[in-house]
Amino acid sequence: MIDENNDVSEEALSSDIKKLKEKHDMLDKEISQLIAEGYRVIELEKHISLLHEYNDIKDVSQMLLGKLAVTRGVTTKELYPDFDLNLND
């Protein structure tokens, strides 16, 4: 906790450290489980990178569809069939 003088209590710091250690342990267990299932760290990093790229492209696409919808005076949803897009995607 931070008091009026911007001082952090030792108790608050200890609590934060404990929570971080617990999170670290949990993540270590998840990594070990993924490795046991046959995943490799490099593959996971590549997959995460590709997901970020996909999300960036999707965000730009949604922005462009929104601008086109405004120009045409329709909703974005109404444009999906024009571009063979899945409404659930």
Swiss-Prot record:
Domain of life: Eukaryota
Pfam families: Swi5
Entry-linked InterPro entries: DNA-repair_Swi5
Record localization: Nucleus
Chief location category: nucleus
PANTHER family attached to this UniProt entry: DNA REPAIR PROTEIN SWI5 HOMOLOG
Name of this protein: DNA repair protein SWI5 homolog
Species name: Mus musculus (Mouse)
